[in-house]
């Protein structure tokens, strides 16, 4: 079973479908997590034989290797098959691949039952590995009619405990305050262009089931920083509807806190919301409950470079092995 944790949009899927049709190939793998808390697959993976190495401009070193021993391949296949897979990145690619497979199968009656078009290339890694890196993606709101930072803070106080942070504080100071707040519940930092900043932590004395916007979130989502930000602040205070959030009408999604704060203080945008990274366990809990998180809730790092491995999608060529 494959579990998504984000909704997909029709525009990006249409773009990817055109790429599939033009290239008849999967040029960029998905990114999925399997469960292996006892690291039982490590010994099989260790049999891999090196094929190539390269470094990308972002400073990441990549190694490509091949597992060819039959017993190792079987151990990996069986181990992954026992696990529910969580999509970390590549929701649009995955759904597009499914649609493309149906399209080709319908148009090509002679297509092999194990044709290449029926398989999706994906990078799999152990979701229980403590070395797995997830970075936060922040929210930078802009073009807000009549917005004032003071009014945001005043309205937020009905839902959040408000703690003023040092004016003009560096990004490291703000993100450190966020890290310390994690133990108290969902929290974000709101920063203004003039240097003001506040730590907002969800109050424990309010009935979330009766909250105007948070009540529409399933309880499992109300435990996450990102869902509380989107429902409690972006929609509840700033009036950015879920549809506008999906369309990115008033939002940018920066990944580096220092760079985003610098742009804000240089006059770009109205307010910056800094986030903690969403723990993998929270993402899996939401997905297993059948829900999805807001867009760009996670940023798994590093990504596999496009073109490092290519899976052709020829319906007449069968992929070796069992279906």
What are these regions (language model features)?
Residues 1-323:
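Surface-exposed, charge/polar-rich loops and edge strands
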């Amino acid at each position: 079973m494959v579990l998504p944790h984000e909704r997909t949009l029709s525009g990006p899927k249409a773009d990817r479908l055109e790429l599939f049709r033009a290239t008849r190939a999967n040029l960029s793998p998905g990114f999925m997590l399997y469960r292996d808390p006892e690291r039982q697959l490590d010994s099989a993976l260790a049999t891999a034989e090196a094929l190539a190495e390269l470094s990308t401009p972002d400073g990441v070193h990549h190694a490509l290797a091949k597992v060819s021993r039959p017993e190792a391949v079987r151990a990996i296949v069986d181990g992954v098959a026992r696990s529910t897979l969580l999509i970390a990145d590549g929701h649009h690619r995955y759904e597009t691949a499914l649609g493309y497979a149906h399209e080709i199968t319908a148009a090509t009656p002679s297509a092999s039952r194990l044709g290449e078009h029926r398989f999706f290339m994906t990078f799999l890694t152990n979701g229980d590995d403590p070395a797995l890196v997830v970075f936060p993606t922040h929210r930078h709101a802009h073009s807000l009619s009549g917005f004032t930072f003071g009014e945001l803070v005043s309205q937020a106080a009905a839902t959040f405990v408000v703690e003023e942070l040092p004016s003009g504080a560096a990004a490291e100071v703000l993100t450190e305050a966020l890290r310390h707040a994690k133990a108290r519940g969902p929290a974000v930092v709101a920063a203004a262009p003039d240097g003001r900043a506040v730590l907002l932590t969800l109050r424990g004395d309010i009935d979330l089931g009766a909250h105007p916007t948070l009540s529409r979130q399933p309880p499992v989502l109300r435990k996450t920083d990102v869902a509380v930000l989107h429902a409690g602040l972006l929609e509840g205070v700033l009036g950015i509807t879920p549809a506008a959030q999906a369309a990115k009408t008033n939002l940018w999604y920066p990944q580096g806190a220092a760079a985003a704060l610098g742009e804000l203080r240089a006059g770009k945008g109205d307010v910056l919301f800094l986030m903690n990274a969403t723990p993998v366990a929270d993402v899996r809990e939401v997905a297993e409950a059948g829900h999805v998180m807001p867009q760009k809730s996670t940023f798994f790092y590093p990504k596999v470079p496009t073109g490092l491995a290519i899976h052709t999608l020829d319906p007449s060529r069968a992929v070796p092995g069992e279906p």
